[in-house]
């Protein structure tokens, strides 16, 4: 046809058979990528330490999505929650990956078949004998089927009625596991962090989709609406049902991922930046220590009972906003593989007063080391200019003692060591990190939470403009073609001096 490269899809405009073929090929590519990516991630994933080296630290992207839907076991004999297993069954990580690849192959073959045999009787309009699609009817079919799938997911898969349930955890990401979820039909179902809302919303949305699908199958659109919204034009479908629905969904999931929700557990995707900004895990750690002290435990005992997993969340290296958008690689490639918690440093001045290191804000690369007391008064610092210092570690006589972790009970008083741990305390809890194994460069990376958000927000914006573009094309097709819909005289096209100019010469044929 001699079309330019950016007009490739014009070929499918009036060819229902090949339109179906290209969509099948697209599905084949998506499913094939998903299965192949899963197998690649399984090949490089190390399941040995789910606490300090979880999937999100290793940069896994599709494994977390499989896990949140109920897949936890591998044919390699390991479980995502730790330990070994003997009978993972067909619905393991490898089983799901393989099923996607098989499905991709079948779609590939079907796409080829429909490309070759494009002139099918089912696509022919009985009245005209030309290929055509009843788009409102097809819309009803798709709405009905997607409603059935949506209802089935909420009523059976999520609830565990026929399925595994979904990943559910506590607010601090410590006790996560796959379990069945009861629908939340009260106001609590609108809380984005309540798993029951996932079940109830899918049941409700699925029911609505089924009813709406049946409505569109049984009721024809009015002629005025049909013409006004260009329902006979395939580009209307592209603009609305396809692009608009996808960009809206992409914006929504970018938000639920970045701000956190029950659908994006921190055990699978890592913590959010707001949990660092608000001192979310730090407050919980101090609450637990305070409870222990109230039960007459010693400081050492109280801090030793803090789960290593909780302490690890309270480390800025796990903040998805610390890694640059264009720094490739997993978190482990940045600051290294976490080996162990050194413990919590309690820092005191020579008067025995507890002082606390100010934590670095998310978007700072460097931050002055300042130590405040309980009242927010500056008691010590690491000065830029020693000649003018008043609160330097050496002058104030600061010491540090560790509670919990590997250095439990160890104390330091020499200024160089104290300053070293004060600097590290700016970044939250202190961990020993192995940077040699992966040749980690020490520069923070983002987690899959950050990558997912960036990707979906970017494509949502792109698709939004695509929606405007194709919506305008289909609504104003006659205007763009230069044909006046009210034109009653035959006109020699190309004789116009200016489109829409009533003084332009018209030549009656």
Curated annotation (Swiss-Prot):
Keywords: Chlorophyll, Chloroplast, Chromophore, Membrane, Photosynthesis, Photosystem II, Plastid, Thylakoid, Transmembrane, Transmembrane helix. The keyword Iron does not apply. SUPFAM superfamilies: Photosystem II antenna protein-like (SSF161077). Pfam families: PSII. Coiled coil: none annotated. It comes from the Eukaryota. Its main location: plastid. Belongs to the PsbB/PsbC family. PsbB subfamily. It is a multi-pass membrane protein. InterPro entries: PS_antenna-like, PS_II_antenna-like_sf, PSII_PsbB. One of its GO terms (cellular component) is photosystem II. One of the components of the core complex of photosystem II (PSII). It binds chlorophyll and helps catalyze the primary light-induced photochemical processes of PSII. PSII is a light-driven water:plastoquinone oxidoreductase, using light energy to abstract electrons from H(2)O, generating O(2) and a proton gradient subsequently used for ATP formation. It is found in: Plastid, Chloroplast thylakoid membrane. The chain crosses the membrane at residues 21-36, 101-115, 140-156, 203-218, 237-253, 458-473. GO terms for molecular function: chlorophyll binding; electron transporter, transferring electrons within the cyclic electron transport pathway of photosynthesis activity. PSII is composed of 1 copy each of membrane proteins PsbA, PsbB, PsbC, PsbD, PsbE, PsbF, PsbH, PsbI, PsbJ, PsbK, PsbL, PsbM, PsbT, PsbX, PsbY, PsbZ, Psb30/Ycf12, at least 3 peripheral proteins of the oxygen-evolving complex and a large number of cofactors. It forms dimeric complexes. Gene3D superfamilies: Photosystem II CP47 reaction center protein (3.10.680.10). Binds multiple chlorophylls. PSII binds additional chlorophylls, carotenoids and specific lipids. One of its GO terms (biological process) is photosynthetic electron transport in photosystem II. This is Photosystem II CP47 reaction center protein.
């Amino acid at each position: 046809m001699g079309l330019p490269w950016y007009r490739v899809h014009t070929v499918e405009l009036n060819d229902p058979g090949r339109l179906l073929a290209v969509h099948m090929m697209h599905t084949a590519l998506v499913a094939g990528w998903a299965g192949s990516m899963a197998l690649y991630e399984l090949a490089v994933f190390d399941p040995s330490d789910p606490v300090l080296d979880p999937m999100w630290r290793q940069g896994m992207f599709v494994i977390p999505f499989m896990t949140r839907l109920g897949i936890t076991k591998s044919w390699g004999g390991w479980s995502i929650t730790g330990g070994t297993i003997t009978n993972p069954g067909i619905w393991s990580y490898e089983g799901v990956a393989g099923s996607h690849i098989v499905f991709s192959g079948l779609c590939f073959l079907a796409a080829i078949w429909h490309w070759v045999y494009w002139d099918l009787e089912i696509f022919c309009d009985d009245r005209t004998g030309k290929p055509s699609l009843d788009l409102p009817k097809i819309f009803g079919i798709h709405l009905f089927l997607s409603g059935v799938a949506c209802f089935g997911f909420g009523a059976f898969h999520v609830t565990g009625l026929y399925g595994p349930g979904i990943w559910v955890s506590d607010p601090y990401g410590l006790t996560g596991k796959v379990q069945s979820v009861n629908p939340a039909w009260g106001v609590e179902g609108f809380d984005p962090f309540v798993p029951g809302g996932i079940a109830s919303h899918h049941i409700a949305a699925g029911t609505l989709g089924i009813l709406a699908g049946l409505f569109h199958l049984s009721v024809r659109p009015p002629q005025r609406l049909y013409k006004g919204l260009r329902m006979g034009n395939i580009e209307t479908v592209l603009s609305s049902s396809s692009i608009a629905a996808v960009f809206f969904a992409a914006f929504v999931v970018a938000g639920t991922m970045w701000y956190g929700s029950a659908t994006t557990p921190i055990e699978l995707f890592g913590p959010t930046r707001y949990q660092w900004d608000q001192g979310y895990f730090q407050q919980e750690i101090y609450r637990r220590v305070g409870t222990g002290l109230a039960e007459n435990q010693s400081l050492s005992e109280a801090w030793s009972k803090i789960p290593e997993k909780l302490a690890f969340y309270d480390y800025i290296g796990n903040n998805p906003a610390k890694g640059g958008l264009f720094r490739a690689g997993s978190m482990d490639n940045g600051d290294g593989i976490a080996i162990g918690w050194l413990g919590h440093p309690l820092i005191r001045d020579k008067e025995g007063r507890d002082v606390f290191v100010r934590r670095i804000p998310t978007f700072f690369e460097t931050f002055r080391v300042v130590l405040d007391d309980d009242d927010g008064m500056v008691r010590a610092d690491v000065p830029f200019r020693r000649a003018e210092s008043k609160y330097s570690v050496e002058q104030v006589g600061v010491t540090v003692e560790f509670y919990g972790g590997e250095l439990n009970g160890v104390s330091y008083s020499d200024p160089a060591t104290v300053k070293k741990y004060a600097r590290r305390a700016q970044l939250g809890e202190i961990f020993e990190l192995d940077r040699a194994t992966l040749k980690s460069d020490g520069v923070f990376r983002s987690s899959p939470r950050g990558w997912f958000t960036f990707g979906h927000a970017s494509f949502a914006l792109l698709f939004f403009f695509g929606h405007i573009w194709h919506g305008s094309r289909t609504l104003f097709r006659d205007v763009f073609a230069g044909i006046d819909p009210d034109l009653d005289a035959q006109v020699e096209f190309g004789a116009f001096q200016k489109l829409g100019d009533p003084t332009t010469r018209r030549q009656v044929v």
